[in-house]
């Protein structure tokens, strides 16, 4: 079984865990490609997610790699992938908004599930390369548990094939999804207010139905983003749109 794993450095803390899982599996022919400084490769692979896994040279997989997925590959099976389309809650989540920086990035990394100090350290180092003190906002409840968050990078920094200039910021991820509560709107709005001090436009990639990693297209439209058209389509998984908003 051959696996070609494309990833955007440690923009997503799960990338650290996935690279470790893959490296520990000796039964797979593995090739890894960091697209952080390779926009031409990201464009060639039509990549708009933090990771892209190609199995046996032809099967694309977008969602995170797990130990269970590795076991399936070792058994000679390619698991079928389904888009992540949970119900989006509409009741505003209540909590405290906190700026995300290198000093508290480990808390934000909990959006990916199980905590991993090493992955948080890798993400903090990755973010520091961009010279920003704040990378977004997270919403915490009264017990300081993570409810949701929104993060960005300067558009000039991202390898994806999206509009890039000094006036444009790019939303890299917007989380978490709950069936009752809306945990994403508050941190996204806080981030937009902060970005308006430096940028005039913000862009994001949204799927028509799936919520990973930025919320679906309906969520973006509700927040005033305009549809700039389809940038990529996989009939088995996603139809991605570039969305933009003047701020």
For the regions a language model picked out, list residue spans one by one.
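Local sequence-structure signature of Cys/Sec-based thiol-disulfide redox active-site neighborhoods
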Residues: 1-26
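A short helix-loop-beta-strand connector motif used in the catalytic cores of GNAT acetyltransferases and
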Residues: 45-48, 126-138, 148, 170
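Conserved beta-strand in the GNAT
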Residues: 138, 144-158, 170, 175
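A short, internal acetyl-CoA/4′-phosphopantetheine-binding micro-motif in the GNAT/acyltransferase core
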Residues: 172-183, 208-209
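Conserved acetyl-CoA-binding loop-helix of GNAT-fold acetyltransferases
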Residues: 180-196
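Conserved GNAT acetyl-CoA-binding A-motif
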Residues: 195-211
């Amino acid at each position: 079984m051959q696996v070609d794993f494309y990833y955007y450095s440690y923009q997503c803390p799960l990338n650290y865990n996935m690279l470790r899982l893959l490296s520990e599996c000796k039964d797979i022919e593995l090739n890894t490609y960091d697209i952080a400084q390779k926009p031409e490769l990201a464009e060639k692979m039509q990549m708009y997610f933090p990771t892209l896994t190609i199995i046996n040279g032809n099967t694309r997989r977008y969602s995170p790699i797990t130990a269970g997925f590795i076991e399936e590959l070792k058994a000679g099976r390619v698991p079928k992938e389904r888009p992540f389309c949970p119900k989006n809650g509409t009741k505003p989540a209540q909590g405290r908004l906190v700026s995300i920086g290198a000093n508290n990035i480990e808390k934000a990394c909990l959006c990916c599930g199980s905590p991993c100090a090493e992955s948080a350290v890798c993400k903090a180092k990755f973010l520091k390369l961009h010279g920003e003190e704040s990378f977004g906002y997270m919403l915490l409840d009264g017990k300081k548990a993570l409810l949701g968050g929104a993060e960005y990078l300067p558009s000039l920094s991202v390898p994806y094939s999206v509009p890039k200039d000094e006036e444009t910021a790019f939303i890299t991820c917007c989380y978490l999804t709950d069936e009752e509560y809306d945990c994403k709107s508050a941190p996204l709005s806080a981030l937009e207010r902060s970005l308006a001090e430096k940028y005039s436009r913000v862009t994001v990639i949204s799927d028509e139905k799936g919520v990973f990693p930025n919320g679906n297209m309906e969520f973006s439209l509700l927040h005033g983003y305009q549809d700039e058209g389809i940038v990529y389509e996989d009939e088995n998984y996603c139809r991605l749109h570039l969305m933009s908003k003047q701020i």
